[in-house]
Amino acid sequence: MKTTPFTEKHIALGAKMHEFAGYNMPIEYSGIIDEHLTVCNAVGVFDVSHMGEFWVKGPQALAFLQKVTSNNVAALVPGKIQYTCFPNEEGGIVDDLLVYCYEPEKYLLVVNAANIEKDWNWCVSHNTEGAELENSSDNMAQLAVQGPKAILALQKLTDIDLSAIPYYTFTVGRFAGKENVIISNTGYTGAGGFELYFYPDAAEAIWKAVFEAGEEFGIKPVGLGARDTLRLEMGFCLYGNDLDDKTSPIEAGLGWITKFVEGKEFINRPMLEKQKSEGTTRKLVGFEMIDRGIPRHGYELVNEEGEGIGVVTSGTMSPTRKIGIGMGYVKPEYAKVGTEICIDMRGRKLKAIVVKPPFRK
């Protein structure tokens, strides 16, 4: 299994470790619910060094990105970040990702850990424009410092005014005595905070500094278990569950990152444009349990009569709401907010209601 610069730290802290995307990663430390609530109320630290990073540079960088991504990269100015996806030729999604605009001819793509090789091959094979591509996935470490107290802890470690970095904006500078640290106002938790990218040789010093700075705010390390419950409470999609190579961005409710602007002929645009105007055969929805029960990935969604209407893609017991919540694809006639649906849980038909995420208000 691959390791991150923090793997030994996780083991020393007694984390439950498990393989994820080929990496030995911490799933939980003090427990998923405790870690989840720590992020909601204070500050937690996630090792997300397993994520992939590709540089796209040169005079053809923008033309290449406008072709392979669904969002309008031309709208980005230096210092801004964009959520987007790589559509495939069959109406599905290769991956969802972030695009960081450094300058007009320099972009950083941050992709999902499980898809690094697939995404890299996809980019290389579709680079007919001749953009300069560089896979830096093994040369970057990343910590996500999340929660309402994150800014108070991190501000101690830099002269950069963190309150002047808006959501989906980043800066590069000195942090915890280390140069060239990317400080990004992003996250996968809905609790606020920053994501820090840096060279692996700075990892030890940055980890130590962040935990010392956050001690007075009750900082804790957080594993991938709580990362999943936090993102699900916000209704954020997880690739491999809610998105895959068969789900279209229109079906997944990602029409807002699919821009049909003039001159942007991205991969599979005609099919997605048709879906946008004519509708799809299924839609991704959020739902809350009415009956007691925890929906799980793969459970069948049925109507009152017990007929199949879809499938659960993500589900958990919400640590903040203490009810079962989930997301799944349903036939369009069942997608309206307020519609009652049922989950087939091992032969038991349990009631739920379609809601608009986030589940955590």
Curated annotation (Swiss-Prot):
**Leading EC class:** transferase
Q: Does the keyword Transferase apply?
A: yes
Q: Which GO terms describe its cellular component?
A: cytosol; glycine cleavage complex
* Signal sequence range: none
Q: Which domain of life is it from?
A: Bacteria
Which EC number(s) does the record attach to this protein? 2.1.2.10
Q: Which cysteines share a disulfide bond?
A: none
Biological-process GO terms, alphabetical? glycine decarboxylation via glycine cleavage system
Question: Which family does the record claim for this protein?
Answer: Belongs to the GcvT family.
State the NCBIfam families in the record.
gcvT, PRK00389.1
In its UniProt entry, what is this protein called? Answer: Aminomethyltransferase
Which organism does this record belong to? Bacteroides thetaiotaomicron (strain ATCC 29148 / DSM 2079 / JCM 5827 / CCUG 10774 / NCTC 10582 / VPI-5482 / E50)
Name the lineage.
Bacteria, Pseudomonadati, Bacteroidota, Bacteroidia, Bacteroidales
Which gene is annotated as encoding this protein in its UniProt record? Answer: gcvT
